[in-house]
């Protein structure tokens, strides 16, 4: 007797980060308006850009536009290539004590400065709206929500817009950077997932098995097509943080999108998935920092 053919996989639904980010920004604008109506100060965000790297300039421009949309005042500090660590440290000290500034954003990478961590640690943790300061990461590790790293927090918001439960699910994170992979693991642990982290020392067979077992897959490495779409578990939620420009000019993620989209339940596009959520979450953190300051 011939076995029945397996049911055809339905194409994944797109997690439209642009739309969800716009909804978040609209809500933040209402909160800023209410804050101003109550006689409180306008939230202020210092945006520090060193050099003229094209990619960094695009990111900063998007952040400034988002700030304008929600009513946050952006204070621009566009510094020349060759700005020293000492000069940046002096600027951070000035911003730390400026009552008009509720959030400080240092756009990374910093050209000519090999260790940006010293500067990040110099930012007042109460104004660290990127969520990179060790004190804020430590609060997250202790399950004390404060200013959380923007990309992982934005991904949690994306997950809330699916019809998939998070608690009790198997989650695999590929990539363990300080800004995405590691705090993403903390976020998913807090949400009740069983978390597996994969990195450059993970054997290929273990990586494949971990991906195939993932109900929630987050990939943040920066290598186009690192994860074949055929590895994706049917019905999984796929969050592709990678954004890579190919020789032909196309932007692609770290996951083979076409094959993954035929297997996943939900998947983020690249571009238009995680990136807009990171920017919107930066505004969310800035407003929360202003609210905490009074």
UniProtKB/Swiss-Prot annotation:
A single GO CC term, please?
cytosol
Catalytically driven reaction(s): (6R)-5,10-methylene-5,6,7,8-tetrahydrofolate + NADP(+) = (6R)-5,10-methenyltetrahydrofolate + NADPH; (6R)-5,10-methenyltetrahydrofolate + H2O = (6R)-10-formyltetrahydrofolate + H(+)
Keyword Lipid metabolism present in the record's keywords: the answer is: no
- Keywords for this protein: Amino-acid biosynthesis, Histidine biosynthesis, Hydrolase, Methionine biosynthesis, Multifunctional enzyme, NADP, One-carbon metabolism, Oxidoreductase, Purine biosynthesis
**GO terms for biological process?**
L-histidine biosynthetic process; methionine biosynthetic process; purine nucleotide biosynthetic process; tetrahydrofolate interconversion
Residues binding NADP(+), per UniProt:
175-177, 243
Per its UniProt record, what CDD domains does this chain match? NAD_bind_m-THF_DH_Cyclohyd
Known pathway = One-carbon metabolism; tetrahydrofolate interconversion
SUPFAM superfamilies xref list: Aminoacid dehydrogenase-like, N-terminal domain, NAD(P)-binding Rossmann-fold domains
Write out the similarity annotation. Answer: Belongs to the tetrahydrofolate dehydrogenase/cyclohydrolase family.
Q: How does it assemble?
A: Homodimer.
The free-text function statement in the UniProt record for this protein reads: Catalyzes the oxidation of 5,10-methylenetetrahydrofolate to 5,10-methenyltetrahydrofolate and then the hydrolysis of 5,10-methenyltetrahydrofolate to 10-formyltetrahydrofolate.
HAMAP family attached here? THF_DHG_CYH (MF_01576)
Give the protein's recorded name.
Answer: Bifunctional protein FolD
Gene (name only): folD
């Amino acid at each position: 007797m011939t076995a029945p053919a397996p049911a055809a996989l339905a194409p994944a639904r797109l997690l439209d980060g642009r739309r969800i980010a716009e909804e978040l920004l609209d809500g933040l604008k209402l909160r800023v308006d209410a804050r101003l109506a109550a006689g409180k100060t306008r939230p202020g965000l210092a945006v520090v850009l060193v050099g003229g790297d094209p990619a960094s300039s695009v990111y900063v421009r998007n952040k400034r536009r988002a700030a304008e949309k929600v009513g946050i005042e952006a204070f621009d500090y566009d510094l020349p290539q060759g700005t020293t660590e000492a000069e940046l440290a002096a600027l951070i000290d000035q911003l730390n004590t400026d009552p008009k500034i509720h959030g400080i954003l240092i756009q990374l990478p910093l050209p000519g400065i090999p260790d940006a961590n010293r500067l990040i640690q110099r930012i007042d943790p109460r104004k660290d709206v990127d969520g990179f300061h060790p004190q804020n990461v430590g609060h997250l590790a202790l399950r004390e929500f404060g200013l959380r790293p923007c990309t992982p927090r934005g991904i949690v918001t994306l997950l809330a817009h699916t019809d998939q439960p998070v608690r009790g699910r198997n989650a695999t994170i590929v990539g363990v950077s300080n800004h995405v992979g590691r705090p993403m693991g903390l976020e998913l642990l807090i949400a009740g997932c069983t978390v597996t982290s994969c990195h450059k020392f993970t054997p290929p067979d273990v990586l494949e098995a971990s991906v195939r077992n993932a109900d929630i897959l987050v990939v943040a490495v920066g290598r186009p097509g690192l994860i074949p779409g055929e590895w994706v578990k049917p019905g999984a939620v796929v969050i592709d943080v990678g954004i890579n420009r190919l020789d032909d000019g196309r932007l692609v993620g770290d996951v083979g999108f076409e094959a993954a989209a035929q297997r996943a339940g939900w998947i983020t596009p690249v571009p238009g998935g995680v990136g807009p959520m990171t920017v919107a979450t930066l505004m969310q953190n800035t407003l929360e920092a202003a609210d905490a300051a009074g």
